[in-house]
Amino acid sequence: MDAREKDKRAKAYEAGDVSWYEEEFLGLNFGDSRLDKRLGIIMNYRLKSPSGSIPDTFVTWAKTKAAYRFFSNDKVDPELIMKSHKNSTVSRLSGKQIILAIQDTTDISYSSHKDTEGLGYINDSETARGYHYHPTLAVTVEGTPLGILDSQVWVRE
C-alpha cells in the first residue's frame, strides 16, 4: 500500500467511515483487493464467534469454504497479519504507564487428525501430536486486553 492509500484510509477512519479491522490492519496489503476485503469479512465473523471453529463461525458451507480458501492462498501470509496486529497493539500502549505482558504456553492437540503433516509431540506420549503456541498478551492493569505483542509457534520432534 502506497502512502496515498494509507493517508486515504487514515482520513476515512478519522471520519468514522472505517470498521475496526481496517484500523487494526492499516497498511496490510496482500496485493489483491479481494483478499484484503475477505480478511475484513473473516475478522468480523470471528469477532462475533471468537472461540468457534471455522465451520461453526461461518455457518454456511459457501462462507466456510471461502474462509478456508483465504487461509490456503499463497498470497496470504500469517506473519504479515500478525505483524500488522502487533503494530496496532504497540500503538495502543501509548500513554499507558503500566502494561502487563502476560505469557502462557498452550498445547494445540491434533491427535485425532492422523493425516495432518508437520506436527510434533506435545507431551511424553507418542500418540499426542500437535504444536505449542506461546503468546505474550498486552493488558492494562484494569484488565483490558490491548493485543498480542509476540507469539511463538513450534513443534517438538
Give names to the regions the model predicted:
Residues D2-E157:
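Conserved, well-structured functional cores that handle cations and Mg-NTP chemistry
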